[in-house]
């Protein structure tokens, strides 16, 4: 029973996250934290443009709150909005920006190179931007744009790589966008940090 409830709650969280991705894409939605409290459910939305989430005189917040309660069965939802510290290092925000640029008709190569450059300039250790679909002509294909260092498999790839996905609806068809970012503060298991001000001891052992 407990396991079933746990799975149900996780599915609900995923559905809410997908709903926010769709409804708040223009606000630069990143992710949300959902926490149960004694007085209800606190939902913290992280977005590049908090004002777009709040809406005029809080109108958007009220709409979101009502939807969460009625359609998702969230008990007494209380929404708080916080800004994303560095949008260019947030994979979901970057993915949405790439998708929006493609929808405006910008060439996919220009969009891909620009996104990679902005992420690396923000200090990332590595980035991959994957654009898939009917980019030119009738045949679908996948284009990858990358720079820096990236973990592709194993536990580090799951835990240390920030991932974001978005969809661009263009005239030729739907284009999928995937972004993976290794942030500058990520410490890899095999990485050693040497402090610049650390004193290096030099020991010489004399032979007898």
Curated annotation (Swiss-Prot):
Residues 16-85 form the KH type-2 domain. Pfam families: KH_2, Ribosomal_S3_C. GO terms for cellular component: cytosolic small ribosomal subunit. Keywords: Ribonucleoprotein, Ribosomal protein, RNA-binding, rRNA-binding. InterPro entries: KH_dom (IPR004087), KH_dom-like_a/b (IPR015946), KH_dom_type_2 (IPR004044), KH_sf_prok-type (IPR009019), Ribosomal_S3_C_sf (IPR036419), Ribosomal_uS3_arc (IPR027488), Ribosomal_uS3_C (IPR001351), Ribosomal_uS3_CS (IPR018280). GO terms for molecular function: rRNA binding; structural constituent of ribosome. It comes from the Archaea. The keyword Transferase does not apply. GO terms for biological process: translation. The keyword Ribosomal protein applies. Binds the lower part of the 30S subunit head. Belongs to the universal ribosomal protein uS3 family. Part of the 30S ribosomal subunit. PANTHER family: 30S/40S RIBOSOMAL PROTEIN S3 (PTHR11760), SMALL RIBOSOMAL SUBUNIT PROTEIN US3 (PTHR11760:SF32). This is Small ribosomal subunit protein uS3. It comes from Methanocaldococcus jannaschii (strain ATCC 43067 / DSM 2661 / JAL-1 / JCM 10045 / NBRC 100440).
